[in-house]
Design a protein with these regions (language model features):
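Basic, nucleic-acid-binding surfaces and adjacent catalytic neighborhoods in DNA/RNA-processing proteins
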Residues: 1-108
């Protein structure tokens, strides 16, 4: 199972949607086409922790009407870390629009 699919699986991560998926994978520097089983244990722990943390941040930012200010990769053109152009494709079984940096996000 790809990490981009696992994050959108509501039985695994209830409430996580496409924006959170893109932002969490960028925060932990994991390529969306990485298989969950290929993640090192440390990255798997980061995935779970960041999905939870970002979900709470997301809700607070949404309530304050400042959500878009906090997007680092979702609907952006350049990576905020390296300045390279972000990749955009419809990935996973759900074919959801996915943004990522091919330089900063590692495929395991």
């Amino acid at each position: 199972v790809l990490v981009c699919d696992a994050l959108l699986d509501q039985e695994v991560f209830a409430g996580v949607g496409n924006i959170i998926k893109n932002e969490v994978l960028f925060r932990i520097r994991v390529h969306p086409c990485t298989r969950v089983g290929d993640l090192p244990p440390r990255k798997l722990a980061q995935l779970v922790a960041q999905a939870r943390a970002y979900s709470f941040d997301f809700l607070e930012w949404k309530r304050q009407f400042v959500l878009r200010r906090h997007w680092q990769v979702h609907r952006r053109r350049e990576c905020p870390e390296c300045g390279r152009r972000l990749e955009l494709a419809h990935l996973g079984t759900r074919q959801r629009r996915t943004f990522w940096c091919g330089h900063c996000q590692v495929r395991y």
